[in-house]
Amino acid sequence: MSKVCVLTGKKPKYGNNVSHANNHTRTRFEPNLHTKRIWIEEEKRWVKVRVSAKAMKIMSKTGTAELAKLLK
């Protein structure tokens, strides 16, 4: 399963960990993904999606109708 948010499209980013001695080591910054079951009223069924914390905030504000459009 890929680490990509269905709603926002967030993916892992790459960068450096920088120590106090200014040593740089490469690292991968993962998005904050969660698997959620969401009820789609139009289709009368549950849909399992991987969404980021930001996407969950968007869904709570706008509702799941926007998500249903993206999943089709």
Curated annotation (Swiss-Prot):
Keyword annotations of the record: Ribonucleoprotein, Ribosomal protein
Q: Name one GO biological process term.
A: translation
Q: Name one GO cellular component term.
A: ribosome
Gene3D superfamilies, per database record: Ribosomal protein L28/L24
Q: What name has this protein been given in UniProt?
A: Large ribosomal subunit protein bL28
| Species for this entry | Chlorobaculum parvum (strain DSM 263 / NCIMB 8327) (Chlorobium vibrioforme subsp. thiosulfatophilum)
Q: What molecular function terms (GO) are annotated for this protein?
A: structural constituent of ribosome
Tell me its family: Belongs to the bacterial ribosomal protein bL28 family.
Q: Name one Pfam family in it.
A: Ribosomal_L28
